[in-house]
């Protein structure tokens, strides 16, 4: 459990301070998982993702390359490529505040270390894909609630990306159960996901 001496709604400091503290605590819990535990949990999460109707019917899927102790996306990506789906991965140019979307056919050969060392598509090898083609988006994040509220890494990239979509694809987050918290401080610009999938449960946002 996160430790706060009083409810989030009564937190006496700016919201960004609270978000920063939650990130710190949740990332520490995630990082404390052993490699074996992360692999096992990731396998269970992947199995849940692959049977979702939204995934099975999608032809164009946006995912992300795993960084640090995140959910391991490798098996999910391998499955979508094996089934002939278009794989889209995000790219961030240094100094930019937006994600650009690129089709990746072979992650082993077409990725490079980007900003903060996160693997991303090589712009010279991977064509740009318009967001309008996306049917399923796997959304990363640090913390989530059972109401599908999301806390990202602090850059606002996915909040801006999701908020700017003209039409909404399925927005699905994959996370370990240690990343699910009772509540999160929410700003006007924060974007929910449609579903949060963990190794032991699934949570859906209902309007």
What are these regions (language model features)?
Residues 2, 28-31, 107, 122-123, ...:
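Surface-exposed, charge/polar-rich loops and edge strands
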Residues 5-15:
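Arg/Gly-rich low-complexity intrinsically disordered repeat tracts
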Residues 7-9, 90, 140, 185:
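Proline-centered helix-kink/hinge sites
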Residues 15-133:
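N-terminal active-site beta-alpha-beta segment that forms phosphate/nucleotide-binding
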Residues 63-65, 139-140, 198:
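Redox-cofactor binding/interface segments in oxidoreductases and associated redox assembly factors
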């Amino acid at each position: 459990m996160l430790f706060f001496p009083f409810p989030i709604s009564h937190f006496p400091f700016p919201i960004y301070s609270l978000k920063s503290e939650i990130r710190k605590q949740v990332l520490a819990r995630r990082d404390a998982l052993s490699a074996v535990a992360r692999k096992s949990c990731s396998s269970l999460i992947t199995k849940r993702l692959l049977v979702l109707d939204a995934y099975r019917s999608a032809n164009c899927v946006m995912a992300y390359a795993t960084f640090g102790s995140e959910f391991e996306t490798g098996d999910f990506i391998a499955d979508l490529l094996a089934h002939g789906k278009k794989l889209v991965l995000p790219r961030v140019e240094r100094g930019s505040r937006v994600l650009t979307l690129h089709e990746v056919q072979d992650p082993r050969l077409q990725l490079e270390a980007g900003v903060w060392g996160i693997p991303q598509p090589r712009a010279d090898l991977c064509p740009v894909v318009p967001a309008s083609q996306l049917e399923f988006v796997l959304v990363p994040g640090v913390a989530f609630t059972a109401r599908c509220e999301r806390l990202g890494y602090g850059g606002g990239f996915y909040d801006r990306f999701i908020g700017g979509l003209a039409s909404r694809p399925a927005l699905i987050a994959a996370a370990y159960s240690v990343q699910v918290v009772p509540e999160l401080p929410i700003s006007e610009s924060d974007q929910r996901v449609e579903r949060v999938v963990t190794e032991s449960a699934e949570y859906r946002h209902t309007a």
